[in-house]
């Protein structure tokens, strides 16, 4: 590194080398029906993440690598929703299903091995080294929402419910256990003042990095 200083070298070698890429693609089909429309969507998104760190991030010697993290998250989604407008009531309901794919290979040196002048180990190395055991699994759910405005559009009310299930967790197929109801109210007090209130309960499956961790 040009004009290297201890501070610059420390920053260079303490920060990992990160290489990421992502893509999203899909298509949708909309069909008009009486009082609304049906929307059908198919999509795929993927996120690839590589993180490496060496004792010397410029030389990048394999024998000096202290962190090697490679992961990829891919979701293939199919969504169907129906949207209606009847007598001022906006109604939406539908279902979604997706195939989740996750890969993770992790090597991390938490503590290096230390030896004395006689080559005896005085501090054993501590490392994390695993390949994620998480297999491809399904995620699916259904939802419904209804909303309307009253009093010359000054007051609005919205209510909804959804359930998210999966084929991975122990109780993942129990839709009643993952119900997420919510309700929201809004009232226009003046041109620039609106009072909002909402309450709900939300269920969310842990991220793939947690689901795919191995000790």
What are the roles of these predicted feature ranges?
Residues 1, 18-172:
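Face-selective signature of the C-terminal outer-membrane beta-barrel domain
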Residues 2-8, 48-50, 187, 191-215:
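Surface-exposed extracellular loop regions of Gram-negative outer-membrane beta-barrel proteins
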Residues 13-17:
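Non-catalytic, glycine-rich low-complexity segments
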Residues 5-11, 57-61, 122-124, 212-215:
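Short glycine/proline- and charge-enriched loop/turn segments
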Residues 180-186:
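Short, well-ordered alpha-helical packing segments
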Residues 176-177:
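Exposed beta-sheet edge and beta->alpha loop/turn motif
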């Amino acid at each position: 590194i040009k004009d290297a200083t201890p501070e610059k070298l420390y920053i260079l070698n303490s920060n990992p080398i990160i290489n990421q890429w992502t893509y999203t693609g899909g298509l949708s089909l909309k069909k008009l029906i009486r009082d609304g429309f049906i929307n059908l969507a198919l999509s795929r998104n993927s996120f690839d993440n590589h993180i490496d760190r060496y004792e010397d991030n410029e030389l990048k010697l394999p024998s000096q690598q202290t962190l090697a993290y490679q992961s990829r998250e891919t979701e293939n989604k199919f969504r169907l929703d129906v949207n209606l407008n009847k007598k001022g009531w906006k109604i939406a309901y539908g279902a979604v299903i997706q195939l989740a794919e996750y890969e993770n290979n992790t090597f991390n040196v938490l503590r290096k091995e230390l030896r004395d002048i006689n080559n005896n180990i005085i501090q054993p190395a501590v490392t994390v080294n695993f390949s994620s055991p998480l297999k491809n699994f399904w995620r699916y759910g259904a939802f419904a929402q209804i909303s309307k405005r009253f009093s010359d559009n000054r007051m609005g009310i919205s209510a909804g419910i959804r359930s998210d299930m999966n084929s991975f967790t122990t109780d993942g197929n129990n839709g009643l256990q993952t119900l997420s109801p919510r309700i929201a109210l809004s009232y226009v007090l003046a041109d620039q003042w609106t009072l909002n209130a909402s309450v709900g309960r939300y269920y969310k499956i842990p991220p793939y990095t947690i689901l795919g961790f191995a000790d």
